[in-house]
Amino acid sequence: MGIGVIGTKVGMTRVFNEDGVSTPVTVVEVSPNRITQIKNNETDGYDAIQVTFGSKHAGRVSKPEAGHYAKAGVEAGQGLWEFRLDDVSEVEGLEPGSEITVEKFNDVAVVDVSGTTKGKGFQGGVKRHNFKMQDATHGNSVSHRAPGSIGQNQTPGRVFKGKKMAGHMGNVKQTTLNLELVKVDVENSLLLIKGALPGAKGSTVIVRKAIK
């Protein structure tokens, strides 16, 4: 995997091309990602680059975190993220304290975006797994949205792991692959990505160059 950026999902809008065709896009604000550490195989067992972005109130920063940020010479951020490196040449010219901006995506056409999906709470099978509903009438009284059978008989005598049933929906990490990068707005530090991205407005997303 290569170096990406950490950003904030702003919301959705649309842009028009020269022919007047509308394209729905999600706006991601990418404040400069500050490098806090560059890891290598000799000292850490793997090659990676560690970054932070945004800011955090001084009272919320623990002493170990404060020391880590001070060693890198950067302001304390909202958290720490790592990008593992397959090619160590990507970090040439970079060092702790350097910044990664949206300019990194000037020559990128397709990206992968990771985020945490919206939480939906406890949901039934119809909403959570798109189960078909049972008959609305004709003798059906209380099982309109019931899932039906969840297993077999005395053999195997249990419910298989992973059986689709009612339960907690959403609030999981999800990556959407191969999204078109419509525009890179360097002046305003924005990425305009075609389509929807996982997560709510204001949530943190990770944008990388597409891997396949």
Curated annotation (Swiss-Prot):
Q: Where is the PTM N5-methylglutamine found along the chain?
A: 154
Family classification: Belongs to the universal ribosomal protein uL3 family.
Asked whether the UniProt record includes Ribosomal protein among its keywords, one would answer yes
Key words of the record: Methylation, Ribonucleoprotein, Ribosomal protein, RNA-binding, rRNA-binding
Q: How is it modified after translation?
A: Methylated by PrmB.
What GO biological process terms are annotated to this protein in UniProt? Answer: translation
In terms of PANTHER family, this protein maps to: 50S RIBOSOMAL PROTEIN L3, LARGE RIBOSOMAL SUBUNIT PROTEIN UL3C
Protein role? One of the primary rRNA binding proteins, it binds directly near the 3'-end of the 23S rRNA, where it nucleates assembly of the 50S subunit.
Q: Which domain of life is it from?
A: Bacteria
Entry-linked SUPFAM superfamilies: Translation proteins
Origin organism is: Hydrogenovibrio crunogenus (strain DSM 25203 / XCL-2)
**What HAMAP family does the annotation carry?**
Ribosomal_uL3_B (MF_01325_B)
How does this protein assemble?
Part of the 50S ribosomal subunit. Forms a cluster with proteins L14 and L19.
Provide the organism lineage as a comma list. Answer: Bacteria, Pseudomonadati, Pseudomonadota, Gammaproteobacteria, Thiotrichales
* Gene Ontology terms, MF aspect: rRNA binding; structural constituent of ribosome
Instruction: Give yes or no: UniProt keyword Membrane.
Output: no
Task: Provide the protein name.
Answer: Large ribosomal subunit protein uL3
One term under GO cellular component: cytosolic large ribosomal subunit
A Pfam family hit: Ribosomal_L3
Q: Which InterPro entries does its entry note? A: Ribosomal_uL3 (IPR000597), Ribosomal_uL3_bac/org-type (IPR019927), Ribosomal_uL3_CS (IPR019926), Transl_B-barrel_sf (IPR009000)
